């Protein structure tokens, strides 16, 4: 009964939590080739009443992924500076991404452990208006990616860039963190930023100032450590510190020539003095070659084996034949040597020679006295009288 009373409130709390995590749905309309920015605000996920501000100490983190996949699509990125700051989903869709995509976002409250889900329905379509064939990319070293994503800094950058470009409408095409391009993480010093690449497009041609900055002469000066060729006033300073040595201009007004599609031929090469086709070789039977390769070494080995056996077994003289061929004087001399050797060995084994006195036990080298082996050694003085 006690266990039932314990589990009932717990199940009620879990069911209430599941009810809180019911996914909200929002429909967005990204455009192909244009930057898309969606802010993940704490107010949206906390579901606070109206006119109630978000507590400054709240900690919320987000996890976003494509529905049915563990990660985001390749054109979409996510960033959040800290749990106190909002998160951002940003990127630029490509023509291959055109269509419908569903992004699932889960918010985690690190203080109360509440979980809230949101479903973003992205209907990716083509942009309206004129094409933007003139595109320029700038490296801004004074900002991080999440500092440029809000609409206010982005509009300020486009307005400042208008002083360097021909009159015309400028549109933001893409924003990429410098860390995603191989940049280094800055030191934790005040004023150091990661850097961000900002890509801008326009229907108006590039100005002379921008063409001079992106010219080969300007890049050569940058490679030598000199300032680039900037003939106009830098209207982006001091709010945006642009690295003018990393400016890229892309002109898509001139269509690129289409790749030639190779046409299949008849398979017959034209006359070429450097190409000598191989002649047709008739069919050959390699059975004879294989037999010769295998049998000839075997026959040679067999003949050598028979010859060696004949020499070792049939050509031996034998002891009797060898003794008959040896003279009697030589045989007597040989037997005498063996007999004398045996006699010397017997004499050496039977001789009795007294052992040297120095090797006998209890022998005094000074007096020459020798004690019997059974004398009590405890009664013998350590130092004998020397006469």
UniProtKB/Swiss-Prot annotation:
Any single Pfam family the record assigns to this protein: Sarcoglycan_2_C
Stretches assigned to the Extracellular side: 24-290
Sorted keywords for this record are: Cell membrane, Cytoplasm, Cytoskeleton, Disease variant, Glycoprotein, Limb-girdle muscular dystrophy, Membrane, Phosphoprotein, Signal, Transmembrane, Transmembrane helix
Q: Give the InterPro entries listed for this entry.
A: Cadg, Cadherin-like_sf, Sarcoglycan_alpha/epsilon, Sarcoglycan_C, Sarcoglycan_N
Tissue-by-tissue expression: Most strongly expressed in skeletal muscle. Also expressed in cardiac muscle and, at much lower levels, in lung. In the fetus, most abundant in cardiac muscle and, at lower levels, in lung. Also detected in liver and kidney. Not expressed in brain.
GO function term, MF aspect, one: calcium ion binding
Tell me the membrane topology, using the record's own terms: Single-pass type I membrane protein
Query: Chief location of this protein?
Result: membrane
What's the effect of swapping residue 137 to G? In LGMDR3; associated with P-G-A-Q-P-136 ins
Alphabetical GO CC annotations of the entry are: cell-cell junction; cytoskeleton; dystrophin-associated glycoprotein complex; endoplasmic reticulum membrane; Golgi membrane; membrane raft; plasma membrane; sarcoglycan complex
Places the protein is found = Cell membrane, Sarcolemma; Cytoplasm, Cytoskeleton
Please list every transmembrane segment annotated in the UniProt record, as residue ranges. Answer: 291-311
Positions where Phosphoserine occurs in the chain: 377
Q: Which residues lie on this side of the membrane: Cytoplasmic?
A: 312-387
GO BP term, example: muscle contraction
The protein's recorded glycosylation sites are 174, 246
Signal peptide positions (record)? 1-23
User: Known PANTHER family for this protein?
Assistant: ALPHA-/EPSILON-SARCOGLYCAN FAMILY MEMBER, ALPHA-SARCOGLYCAN
Per the UniProt record, the associated disease is: Muscular dystrophy, limb-girdle, autosomal recessive 3: An autosomal recessive degenerative myopathy characterized by progressive muscle wasting from early childhood with loss of independent ambulation by teenage years. Muscle biopsy shows necrosis, decreased immunostaining for alpha sarcoglycan, and adhalin deficiency.
Q: Which family does it belong to?
A: Belongs to the sarcoglycan alpha/epsilon family.
Subunit info? Interacts with the syntrophin SNTA1. Cross-link to form 2 major subcomplexes: one consisting of SGCB, SGCD and SGCG and the other consisting of SGCB and SGCD. The association between SGCB and SGCG is particularly strong while SGCA is loosely associated with the other sarcoglycans.
Role description: Component of the sarcoglycan complex, a subcomplex of the dystrophin-glycoprotein complex which forms a link between the F-actin cytoskeleton and the extracellular matrix.
Protein name, as recorded: Alpha-sarcoglycan
Q: Which organism is it from?
A: Homo sapiens (Human)
């Amino acid at each position: 009964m006690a266990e039932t009373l314990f589990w009932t409130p717990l199940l009620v709390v879990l069911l209430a939590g599941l009810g809180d995590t019911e996914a909200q749905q929002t429909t967005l309309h990204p455009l192909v080739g244009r930057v898309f920015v969606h802010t993940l605000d704490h107010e949206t996920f906390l579901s606070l009443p109206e006119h109630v501000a978000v507590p400054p100490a709240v900690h919320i983190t987000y996890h976003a992924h494509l529905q049915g996949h563990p990660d985001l699509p390749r054109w979409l990125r996510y960033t959040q500076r800290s749990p106190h700051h909002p998160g951002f989903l940003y990127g630029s869709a490509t023509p291959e991404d055109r269509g419908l995509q569903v992004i699932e976002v889960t918010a985690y409250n690190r203080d109360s452990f509440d979980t809230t889900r949101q479903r973003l329905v992205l209907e990716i379509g083509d942009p309206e208006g004129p094409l933007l064939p003139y595109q320029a990319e700038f490296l801004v070293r004074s900002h991080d990616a999440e500092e440029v994503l809000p609409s206010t800094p982005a509009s300020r950058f486009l307005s400042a860039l208008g002083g360097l470009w021909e009159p015309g409408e400028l549109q933001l095409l893409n924003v990429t963190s410098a860390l995603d391009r191989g940049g280094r993480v800055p030191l934790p010093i005040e004023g150091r930023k990661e850097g961000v690449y900002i890509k801008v497009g326009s229907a108006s041609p590039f100005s002379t100032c921008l063409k001079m900055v992106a010219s080969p002469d300007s890049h050569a000066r940058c490679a030598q450590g000199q300032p680039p060729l900037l003939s106009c006033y830098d209207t982006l300073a001091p709010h945006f510190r642009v690295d003018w040595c990393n400016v890229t201009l892309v002109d898509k007004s001139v269509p690129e020539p289409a790749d030639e599609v190779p046409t299949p031929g008849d398979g017959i090469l034209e006359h070429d003095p450097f190409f000598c086709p191989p002649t047709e070789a008739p069919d050959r039977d390699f059975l004879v070659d294989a037999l010769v390769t295998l049998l000839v070494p075997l026959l040679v080995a067999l003949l050598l084996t028979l010859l060696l056996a004949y020499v070792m077994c049939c050509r031996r003289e034998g002891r009797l034949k060898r003794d008959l061929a040896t003279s009697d004087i030589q045989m007597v001399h040989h037997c005498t040597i063996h007999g004398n050797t045996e006699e010397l060995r017997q004499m050496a084994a039977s001789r009795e020679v007294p052992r040297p006195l120095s090797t006998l036990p209890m022998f005094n080298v000074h007096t020459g006295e020798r004690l019997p082996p059974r004398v009590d050694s405890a009664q013998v003085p350590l130092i004998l009288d020397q006469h």
